[in-house]
């Protein structure tokens, strides 16, 4: 709650933001109790597009459930598929060819860039700027073309398989990716000149929407939200998986905790993703992309397994309980956006509604991932 504003609970009114509203970026309702233009309290309401993804994971075989993972966070589908196949591979002791691991890293980071570009354009549009959205979507189109060339899809890829990949990459993909990296670095400079150093953007974001490290820990916030509050945690560095321990990259961390800090974390992350992609292509080995011998029907040993990856919005976890059958006895999906969203109710108290929408944009919510 702001120290400068004394709100009167006897002079409030209720304002519904959503569930159909462009600022919520999905079917999300926020029930606001307002005192003028200031927020007295807020309650996020979800459940409008709940699809029972966890229950489907218990009723379908492990292979049949793979397409579901691309339909949670549809902007970061590669990372979610990656987390699931890692959990099954870990539980089933399935070996993955080295070439497949490097290609996974390339495609995940390309998808992370694509996701951040959507966030960047939509976030600036929330603040009243339209042109950056066009710039961002133009760059994102290059990524979608690259991923479509190897997966056949532009959004819900379902590219990974247990033990490897659906399809190999070719020289044309590698050449196109290197051209994109050159283009993207020029674009990042344009974004800095056009947006990041813009005084209007700074006034809208700096010292606004402050999230303390304690609040992050209280709600389990991860990803750019936590790193914008000084919490130096990234699964790729702290708990390396796949071949991320082979790459040299930095984790952007800002300690201010305001909306501008979260903006800067994501902008800096785009350069780090480019570094990872470059190194992965330089070190890309030959060989197969999937083992010659692997079971057609996967049955995992009885046990309780957990796997986590760093998705575009934070730590995505899979808890998989097996009873030895062809499908999971219990499947739990740990959504980063679900945790990040719930701190909004506490942080926005005392804020102007316009600043609260900037705060919501800095959280980078994807509603289908919350409403699983």
From Swiss-Prot:
EC top class, as a word: translocase
GO cellular component, one term: plasma membrane
An MF annotation (GO) of this entry: NAD binding
Catalytic activity: a quinone + NADH + 5 H(+)(in) = a quinol + NAD(+) + 4 H(+)(out)
Presence of the UniProt keyword Cytoplasm in the record: no
EC number: 7.1.1.-
Highest rank taxon of the organism: Bacteria
InterPro entries named in the record: NADH_Q_OxRdtase_suD, NDH1_su_D/H, NiFe-Hase_large
Keyword Transport: yes
Keywords: Cell inner membrane, Cell membrane, Membrane, NAD, Quinone, Translocase, Transport, Ubiquinone
Its membrane topology: Peripheral membrane protein
Compartment list: Cell inner membrane
Assembly information from the UniProt record: NDH-1 is composed of 14 different subunits. Subunits NuoB, C, D, E, F, and G constitute the peripheral sector of the complex.
HAMAP family: NDH1_NuoD (MF_01358)
PANTHER family in alphabetical order: NADH DEHYDROGENASE [UBIQUINONE] IRON-SULFUR PROTEIN 2, MITOCHONDRIAL (PTHR11993:SF10), NADH-UBIQUINONE OXIDOREDUCTASE 49 KDA SUBUNIT (PTHR11993)
Entry similarity comment: Belongs to the complex I 49 kDa subunit family.
Main function: NDH-1 shuttles electrons from NADH, via FMN and iron-sulfur (Fe-S) centers, to quinones in the respiratory chain. The immediate electron acceptor for the enzyme in this species is believed to be ubiquinone. Couples the redox reaction to proton translocation (for every two electrons transferred, four hydrogen ions are translocated across the cytoplasmic membrane), and thus conserves the redox energy in a proton gradient.
Name the record gives this protein: NADH-quinone oxidoreductase subunit D
Protein's organism: Desulfotalea psychrophila (strain LSv54 / DSM 12343)
